[in-house]
Amino acid sequence: MSIKSDRWIRRMAAEHGMIEPFEAGQIKQAAGRSIVSYGTSSYGYDVRCASEFKLFTDINTTIVDPKAFDPNSFVEVKGDSCIIPPNSFALARTVEYFRIPRSVLTICLGKSTYARCGIIVNVTPLEPEWEGHVTLEFSNTTPLPARIYANEGVAQMLFLESDEVCETSYRDRGGKYQGQVGVTLPKI
């Protein structure tokens, strides 16, 4: 497997709609102010968080069970930012919609700006031929409230291309998160 460069990312976005909307370079300012950067980097793509969040609350539940997840465990928040309570988490989605090629596995890593503040981004790999908005999970590991900004960079996607195409892709398996839009809760 090899990591793919900015040139490849730009070509795949232009010719195959791999990332929509797409920024060919790094965007570091908006409306005359500094922002957490997003767009194409040397060997990855920095994604943005949309302005819709699901903030975890323990008001309605006593146990978190991935096989019987209660949607009432979240409060919906819309806005330019979301404040995550101490030792809690929020779900969001990327602004960008992804279409992953059959020979590619995509890994998501958090941006250092957030990591240095105790905010961890968790996303599982984007498998070959998966498509959709990426659901992002932000964990606030600090004892203080933490802010996440919408429409600014929050994580980086790295594209790894295999030297051999997989026999069965995520689409072939009928993956349960295929084509997801919006913030998607756990499914069984």
Swiss-Prot record:
Protein name: dCTP deaminase
GO MF terms, alphabetically ordered: dCTP deaminase activity; nucleotide binding
Entry superkingdom: Bacteria
Disulfide bond positions: none
Active site residues per record: 137
Gene: dcd
A Pfam family recorded for this sequence: DCD
PANTHER family per record: DCTP DEAMINASE
EC id: 3.5.4.13
Keyword annotations from UniProtKB, A to Z: Hydrolase, Nucleotide metabolism, Nucleotide-binding
Signal sequence annotation: none
Free-text function comment from the UniProt entry: Catalyzes the deamination of dCTP to dUTP.
Gene3D superfamilies noted in UniProt: 2.70.40.10
Pathway(s) the chain acts in: Pyrimidine metabolism; dUMP biosynthesis; dUMP from dCTP (dUTP route): step 1/2
Chain sites annotated for binding dCTP: 111-116, 135-137, 156, 170, 180
Subunit structure: Homotrimer.
InterPro entries, sorted: dCTP_deaminase, dUTPase-like_sf, dUTPase_trimeric
Catalytic activity: dCTP + H2O + H(+) = dUTP + NH4(+)
Source organism of the structure: Thiobacillus denitrificans (strain ATCC 25259 / T1)
A biological process from GO: dUMP biosynthetic process
Family to which the UniProt record says this protein belongs: Belongs to the dCTP deaminase family.
